Amino acid sequence: MHEVGFPLDLSVFTRLIATLFFLAVGVFYFLKNTAAKYFDIGAAAAGGFDRDFMAVDAEDCSVCGNFSTKKCSRCKSVRYCSAECQRSDWSSGHQRNCRDYGITTLTPSAKNGLRFRASPFGDSSASSIALISERGQNKSSLKPREVLFPYEEFVEYFNWDNPELAPCGLMNCGNSCFANVILQCLSWTRPLVAYLLEKGHKRECMRNDWCFLCEFQTHVERASQSRFPFSPMNIISRLTNIGGTLGYGRQEDAHEFMRYAIDMMQSVCLDEFGGEKIVPPRSQETTLIQYIFGGLLQSQVQCTVCNHVSDQYENMMDLIVEMHGDAGSLEECLDQFTAEEWLHGDNMYKCDRCSDYVKACKRLTIRRAPNILTIALKRYQGGRYGKLNKRISFPETLDLNPYMSEGGDGSDVYKLYAVIVHLDMLNASFFGHYICYIKDFCGNWYRIDDSEIESVELEDVLSQRAYMLLYSRIQARSSSSCLRSEVKDEKKTDTLDTESCVKELVESSMVGAIESRSSTHATIEDPVCEQSPSPSPSPSPSPSPSPSPSVLASECCSEVERIDTLDSESNSSIDDSATDHQEDVANGNKDPEVKYQAADSWSDPTTSTPLVCTKSKPPVRDMDTKMIDAQ
């Protein structure tokens, strides 16, 4: 007798159940990790703490003091070794103080697309998902700020002083001397160190991934507290994150690493306000990093045919100076940098006014000097053994006023505080060793060779064959808005030119209308409709913004209409006056060169103020100023 039904193999069924169980567990953990990555869980309600806000780090636990690998992902300041310690600290008061430590749960993440919103009923387990895109909400709702960092606060950091700080050596992690010297120079850049030690960046950081400024703050804090050399592996191991072409274990250029580091810090500052694509170019110049290293170069080109002058501005973070000919000092190199250059031959300049390639004179100057001036001497030329090893003397006090666009006001004076030297063999440019000389906040100079520190005199520093020089202004810039005033002046000049063009068009139409109205009218050249002042005294009006070209056109057109609508009596009086004027000229009673102003006999039927048409030339603009914003 056959059994009815599907035959069941117990071993196959067991394996199937086990497989389904492991698949379910895998899918569960996958969804859990995905949710933890893309959602912020808010449990700040009064119900208590039942979520683990953890992030990887390496500090001591704030509860038991053991080695910790996690931290609170809200404030990013308190660290724990386990979830039990975090729950204990949460219930003992961290729940109330977490907001004061740093970022709260309501702060939008810079990366997460969605977030969890805490339940209004006080039960943290009943948290609900707020299906609102944080990224899209930030871009559409955040209003662009004109000033990202207060300049007055920067001036306080610039004048900050801490004489107790002493230099600390850094261990060489394998061809990392190029990074060690830059980290030493940045660690003794006064406004940057003052900001990291006094205010700090970690609590305000909006990044969920690796942040160079956060790591550099940890580096500065450790260097200020340590008496022994330590390894900067937290930064060296992330060279590819700092610069795409940098690599761990390879010999790299110190100047290139510094450029990457400054650009990375600038990018971090912009991320706090939405990123480089959202922040306007003008506001990008108001970050802390721009206040420290940012300046402005002016490139001026003058046409030799029409004398047309064109100015272009470019943002600068450092100054790369070449060593041409017999230049033996930094001042001579700067003279060559700002010297006039003739554009001719195959390098002719295309003039916008001439619309042709012409011979021109070009000069590059400094429009706005930075607070921290970084000068890189271009010692490397073509070839593997093409390094220029000649000594270039440099002063302790550098006066930058002779190299400014407008001669300077005497305040662009700098003091030397760091020197980077590249040691090589046989003028090789592909290998060598970097050392640096640093001046502390008390004025003492030190020679730092990785982990070795030696006190030196100023004469030893000035005798070196420097590769990079770092100068600090004696006094911070008085204002950071000089570029904006220039742009405002440019816009005002452009507006005047536009108004003049509109006036010319209106004037030509007025002349045509008057001539067509009456052929016996007196001669009128290029009239510009104005109103003569009223004889009765009146209080001076308050200044008002200049009218737009459309308003000017409408006003002048209204004057034309009023002229065209003159009655026959006014026309006859004008004809009679013109006839009398011709008779006087014929009899010799009047000078024929004097133009009779027929408008004197015109009157507005609606007002007692007479209308006067006078000769007025539009302003001619010889300067075409352009602005190049650094991206």
Swiss-Prot record:
Record's bilayer topology term: Single-pass membrane protein
Catalytic-site annotation from UniProt: C177, H433
Binding, Zn(2+) 1: C61, C64, C81, C85
Main location class: membrane
Enzyme category, top tier: hydrolase
Chain ranges passing through the membrane: 10-30
PANTHER family recorded: UBIQUITIN CARBOXYL-TERMINAL HYDROLASE (PTHR24006), UBIQUITIN CARBOXYL-TERMINAL HYDROLASE 18 (PTHR24006:SF929)
UniProt-recorded name of the protein: Ubiquitin carboxyl-terminal hydrolase 18
Organism this protein belongs to: Arabidopsis thaliana (Mouse-ear cress)
Phylogenetic lineage: Eukaryota, Viridiplantae, Streptophyta, Embryophyta, Tracheophyta
